[in-house]
Design a protein with these regions (language model features):
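Non-catalytic alpha-helical scaffolds and adjoining flexible linkers that form interface surfaces
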Residues: 1-164
Length: 164
C-alpha cells in the first residue's frame, strides 16, 4: 500500500520518507499515544500524496465550514447541499481531532476523548483505503487498546508483559 502513496515507481519520495522517519521517532520516543501518532502519520502521508482531506470548508463546493457531514468520496467535510446519502456525521470533537492530527497540534489532539479518537481512526482508515483503492488487511490488526497504551506508557520490560 505504501507504494501507492509515492509519485512514481523508483522515484524518490523524500517527503514521504521524512514523514515516516519522523513518525517512527515519535513512536520510539513514547511521548505520544501510538494510535494518535499512527493516525497523524496516515493523514499527513495522504496529504503529501495529494489527497489531503478537508476538515473546514466543504470538500465539494468550498462553502465555509464548519460542516456536520464527512464524505470519504467527496474528500472530507461536506455542506448540507453537497452531502451524499452515505456521509458520516462525526461529532464536533472528532472533527477537531482530525484537523489537529493533520496539523500536528498534539495539545489539541491529546485533549480529545477515547470515543472521538476511535471515531476519527475509523474515518481515517476509510479515507485511506478509498484513496489506495484497496483494503489494508493489516490495519484492523493494529492494537489500539488502552491496555497497550498503558503498557507502553509505563515503559515496562517485555518480561513484565509476560508476567515473569
Amino acid at each position: 500500500a505504501a507504494e501507492r502513496l509515492t509519485p512514481a515507481e523508483r522515484e524518490p519520495a523524500v517527503q514521504q520518507y521524512v514523514l515516516l522517519v519522523t513518525g517512527l521517532r515519535a513512536l520510539v520516543g513514547r511521548d505520544r499515544e501510538p494510535a494518535l501518532i499512527l493516525d497523524s502519520y496516515l493523514l499527513r502521508s495522504l496529504a503529501v500524496a495529494g489527497w489531503s482531506p478537508s476538515f473546514g470548508d466543504c470538500a465539494q463546493c468550498g462553502a465555509p465550514g464548519p460542516h456536520r457531514a464527512f464524505s470519504v468520496v467527496a474528500g472530507g467535510m461536506v455542506c448540507s447541499s453537497c452531502r451524499p446519502p452515505a456521509a458520516a456525521a462525526p461529532s464536533a470533537a472528532t472533527i477537531t481531532l482530525l484537523g489537529a492530527l493533520l496539523a500536528g497540534d498534539w495539545e489539541a489532539a491529546e485533549a480529545i476523548g477515547q470515543r472521538e479518537r476511535r471515531e476519527a481512526s475509523g474515518l481515517i482508515a476509510a479515507f485511506l483505503q478509498w484513496h489506495l483503492e484497496r483494503t489494508l488487511r493489516s490495519l484492523p490488526l493494529v492494537d489500539r487498546s488502552e491496555t497497550t497504551d498503558r503498557i507502553l506508557a509505563e515503559d515496562q520490560e517485555p518480561d513484565a508483559w509476560m508476567g515473569r
